[in-house]
A protein has these predicted regions:
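A short acidic, Gly/Pro-enriched loop at the edge of an enzyme's catalytic core
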Residues: 103-111
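A short glycine-rich, Lys/Arg-flanked "PGG" loop and its adjoining helix->strand segment in the class I
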Residues: 124-136
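A short SAM/SAH-binding and catalytic strip from SAM-dependent methyltransferases
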Residues: 110-122
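Class I SAM-dependent methyltransferase SAM/SAH-binding core
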Residues: 46-102
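Conserved catalytic/acceptor-binding region of the Class I
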Residues: 136-194, 208-216
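Conserved Class I S-adenosyl-L-methionine
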Residues: 52-54, 182-244
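Conserved alpha-helix/loop element of class I SAM-dependent methyltransferases that forms part
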Residues: 22-41
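N-terminal, positively charged/glycine-rich alpha-helical extensions of SAM-dependent methyltransferases
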Residues: 1-15
Length: 244
């Protein structure tokens, strides 16, 4: 992954991210509900890839006595998250710029992350390392099957779609079985009146870094595959695992 490009694009999108990140908000809410149902009491939480704070705010409300360490690769995202916190929330939240692949779980009750791990080079290796450090994990990540409609349109035209490779469901299931984790997978969808609206929305949230070596396809050709708009699928995996 080109971390500098990812950081720059998400940072540039921070000011308008929440206007377009509808799926991200839903996934964060669903993850937060699962976290609180499983672990009603937490004291110290590390959040990786907090973005503008969709999961952050759920955690702060659910655990009013907890200390939260919110981290993100993009400083502008951290600033956007800070700007929406109350004085009480700021008093018990630490904000740090951090690459999730270098995170340390020691001293935390829980490491949580919502829709950030798909940007890591080796997400399951990071999960294994953090879990071995003694923390519980609660991760929501996009998996294979995401953007299936967009990818199929490219395939039908013999074009490369440029979508980053997502984790396969089988890989996640094997990891979950090995570590005694609970795995839940759901499909969320979003409908756009025109296919170009989907392309623009992805850019507006900063999630348009392509797969390495990708050469952009003729966009007009792809858009003509969707004369009546497009409904896009997001396959979201929720992984919850107890501490060792």
């Amino acid at each position: 992954m080109d971390k500098q490009r990812i950081q720059a694009r998400f940072g540039h999108a921070a000011h308008e991210y929440d206007d377009y990140a509808h799926i991200q908000k839903t996934a964060a809410q669903h993850l937060a509900e699962r976290i609180h149902a499983r672990w009603p009491e937490l004291q110290r939480v590390l959040e990786l890839g907090c973005g503008t704070g969709n999961l952050t705010h759920h955690l702060l409300r659910a655990y009013p006595g907890a200390q939260l360490h919110a981290t993100d690769l993009a400083p502008d995202m951290l600033q956007a998250c800070q700007a929406t916190c109350s004085a009480d929330q700021l008093a018990r939240t630490q904000f740090s710029t951090l690459d999730a692949e270098t995170a340390n779980a020691h001293g935390y009750d829980l490491v949580a992350s919502s829709l950030a791990f798909q940007w890591l080079d080796k997400p399951l290796a990071v999960c294994s390392r953090l879990h071995s450090q003694g923390a519980r994990l609660a991760i929501a990540t996009l998996i294979d099957g995401t953007f299936a409609e967009w990818k199929a349109a490219h395939q039908a035209l013999g074009l490369s779609d440029g979508v980053l490779p997502f984790l396969g469901e089988g890989c996640l299931q094997r990891w979950a079985h090995k570590h005694g984790a609970v795995l839940h997978i759901e499909t969320l969808t979003e409908t756009y009146p025109q296919a170009i609206d989907f392309v623009r929305a992805i850019k507006h949230i900063g999630a348009h870094t392509p797969r390495e070596g990708h050469r952009p396809a003729p966009l007009a050709k792809v858009l003509r595959q969707f004369p009546h708009g497009i409904t896009v699928s997001y396959r979201v995996a929720y992984l919850l695992v107890e501490s060792v």
